Amino acid sequence: MKKTTKQRLAKADQKMLKIVRDHLDYHLIRVRKWLPYNGRRTSRDVVYEAFIDHGQVSIPVPTDRYSFYVCMHEVGHIVKGERNYAYMQEYVAEQYAIAKCIKHGYLTKEIEESAKRYVFEHMVQDCVIRVLPIDSFSKAVLKWTGRTEEQLRRRALRLAKVLYKDSDEVPNALTSLTAKKLSLSAYKALLEITIKQLTK
């Protein structure tokens, strides 16, 4: 049987929940959904996200340090309002979340490493899906992730080749960026351009 929001919140770490609610209230952010915390496993049914234009978030019930960090990450999207490239949006939200974890004594090495991986993967996606040239990425952000331009190039090339070979649809992320619907052949052509750029 599906749990109610009240039942989910009863399982929260009450100290963490108070901190999260204080941040939400201070920044006038409304919770669209309190979602179950899925223990860092990805799930199509549980998606934590921020709706910047509406000042709303869907966040996990904070039960441990990691779920607290996820809450702060989504709050960070609203507070900072970064709308630039995906990797920059995530970097700014991660910096906000890490700062709050440090302030409240919840930062762990695992959280920090997870944040760096997450931002790097968005750099890879921006490189492939948005066809951003590698030298256009922030050097400071790349350095913070602990990766190099060469690592970014190799990872992006690997992803582009997989997508080029296996794709049978245009990603939603790319469709939402274009004024008109992008055909699959146009998407494949974009991937081909990306592969050529990355193999120069």
Describe these PLM feature segments.
Residues D45-V47, E94, C127:
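Charged, often glycine-rich, active-site loop that binds/positions anionic groups
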Residues Y66-E74:
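Short alpha-helical catalytic segment bearing the HExxH-like zincin motif
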Residues P62-T63, K103-K200:
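Long, well-structured alpha-helical subdomains associated
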Residues M88-K103:
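An active-site-proximal "capping" alpha-helix that borders the catalytic cofactor pocket
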Residues I78, E82, A99-H104, Q197:
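Active-site catalytic microenvironments for nucleophilic, acid-base chemistry
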